[in-house]
């Protein structure tokens, strides 16, 4: 059985489509979901099992940029470890800055990356991940 990881940003526009996708895939695949603290308020914890990951927003506070860049690189290594530990075959990103470390980690590990953009405009994270995505 394929192991699929759905990574989603913290807004309702990212999380709600992710939960629908989770529901659709859960009967045929082993599916996990990852979001950040902002996204947790949109996820029904009784219905969905998910992991919380803290990824800094690089552009929110410019004076924290050096620290946040360091944390971002740590997140990439944590994402690699997460994908290996969970034997993930496919990563599906619905966008949001917290999804990029997982997309990059999947690319490094030669896993398939699928992008699902629920918004009318392609976001920055999915735009960068487009370079190494499968679809």
What are these regions (language model features)?
Residues 30-32, 38, 109-135:
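Active-site-proximal region of nucleotide-activated glycan assembly enzymes
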């Amino acid at each position: 059985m394929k192991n699929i990881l759905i990574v989603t940003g913290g807004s309702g526009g990212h999380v709600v489509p992710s939960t629908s996708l989770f529901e659709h895939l859960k009967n045929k695949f082993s599916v996990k979901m990852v979001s950040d603290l902002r996204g947790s308020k949109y996820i029904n914890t009784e219905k969905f099992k998910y992991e919380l990951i803290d990824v800094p927003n690089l552009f929110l506070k410019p004076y924290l940029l050096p620290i946040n860049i360091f944390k971002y690189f740590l997140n990439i290594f944590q994402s690699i470890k997460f994908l290996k530990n969970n034997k993930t075959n496919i990563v599906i990103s619905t966008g949001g800055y917290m999804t990029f470390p997982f997309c990059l980690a999947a690319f490094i590990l030669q896993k398939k990356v699928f992008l699902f953009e629920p918004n009318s405009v392609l976001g920055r994270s999915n735009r960068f991940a487009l370079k190494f995505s499968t679809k």
